[in-house]
Amino acid sequence: MASKFLREYKLVVVGGGGVGKSCLTIQLIQSHFVDEYDPTIEDSYRKQCVIDEEVALLDVLDTAGQEEYSAMREQYMRTGEGFLLVYSITSRQSFEEITTFQQQILRVKDKDYFPMVVVGNKCDLEGEREVTRQEGEALAKSFGCKFIETSAKSRINVDKAFYDIVREIRRYNREMQGYSTGSGGASGINGPPKPMDVENGEQEAGCCSKCLIM
């Protein structure tokens, strides 16, 4: 039976312009695909879900990818609990920008690790692919986080991308709590939370989940 305690998760979707951040977010929240491209400055959406039998209120911030809005990034990076680092598989430039976002998040948070998921969007456009799946997996592994390919248009792995970051926030918080109380966290080591075991983490299923729009 799902827990009735409503825990809010502040999720931030980051990435370059035109990679489909808004399309992913709207597909999650409203279950439809927005075809036209209207550059986002900043939009916030809320949705209640049950993820692994725990109630979660997702507070999703869809951010601007354009360089002219980069000054706003540190503000939302300070408040975010988990980040989806989104690039388009049809744009190598957007893939190369992901490391910049990851490094900026760690600098703002003053951490060696923080909950993130690398998302290769537009996987329905296989014929236009510029970034291989193996490259995406390797980048995520170097960050110590999960990797997933999605399609907002075809609704492939959209829910799973957001649910995976919630799962990682939960894991991170459990280890933080263990570290702060001196028990060493889930890893059993006296130290701050470590990046997840990506090899084992990939075995998690995207089931046991349902959502309500708030």
Swiss-Prot record:
UniProt superkingdom: Eukaryota
Coiled-coil portions? none
- Give its E.C. classification number: 3.6.5.2
Q: Which UniProt keywords apply?
A: Cell membrane, GTP-binding, Hydrolase, Lipoprotein, Membrane, Methylation, Nucleotide-binding, Prenylation
Chief place where the protein resides: membrane
Residues bearing the modification Cysteine methyl ester: C211
Q: Which residues form the propeptide?
A: 212-214
**Catalysed reactions, as listed in the record:** GTP + H2O = GDP + phosphate + H(+)
The region annotated as signal peptide is none
Give the matching PROSITE patterns.
RAS
GO molecular function term, any single one: GTP binding
As for family, the record states: Belongs to the small GTPase superfamily. Ras family.
Its name, as the record gives it, is: Ras-like protein
